[in-house]
Amino acid sequence: MLIETLRQEARLLVVAPEQAQSGMGHAITLTRPLYLKKVTDEPGLSVYACNGTPVDCVKIAFDCMMLGKEMPSLVVSGINHGSNSAINVLYSGTMGAAIEGGFYDIPSIGFSLLDHDEDADFGTVQQYILPIVRKAMTENLGRPLCLNVNVPNLPAEQIRGIMPCRQNRGYWREVFERRQDPRGHDYYWLCGYFENTEPEATDTDEWALKNGY
């Protein structure tokens, strides 16, 4: 959906991980080779799959595929399954890619939908993609620019609008469950819950999402 929407207004070079990369943050690959596989190559759209992390994808796009060529006007990543509010920004592969784009001094945006279902309906996000992209491209929002866009999992008519806000200071209370595999070997499974340390603050991303923004 992100490609289909952006393609309406721009030429696209897409370099995306070939597998899900949740929780990869700003990880890069140092101990194995990276490969690119061409998926689509047609006028206005080139798509490649990479066996690396989201940040690897941005790096290889800038430092290999566009070396000596015109730099892009914008870097966009997503659409992420689930929230990238609060401390989740630091763990997010989606936002890792967007932040990496900012390191190249290119305006960058990461999109997320608060729905973890594999068959999540991203239609709600779609209506905000182009308006936010146009704003990032045409208004002086400062440089480097990296926007973290989170959309609540609500019907479109229930979303109250776009609210610029700061990052919540909450964090995860982590619990490692000790389990055993079929051969009797112990292993650990990360669980836990998010603790909002400033629930009364009305200027944070957590508040905005819980209140339909």
Predicted feature locations:
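A cross-family phosphate/adenosyl-ligand binding-site feature
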Residues: 4-64, 71
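Short beta-strand segments
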Residues: 15-17, 51, 77-80, 111-112, ...
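Alpha-helix C-terminal capping segments
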Residues: 61-68, 96-107
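Short, structured loop/turn "capping" segments at alpha-beta junctions
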Residues: 69-72, 108-110, 139-146
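Glycine/threonine-rich flexible loop motifs
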Residues: 83-92
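Glycine-rich phosphate/pyrophosphate-binding loops
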Residues: 102-124
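Electrostatically charged, flexible surface regions
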Residues: 123-213
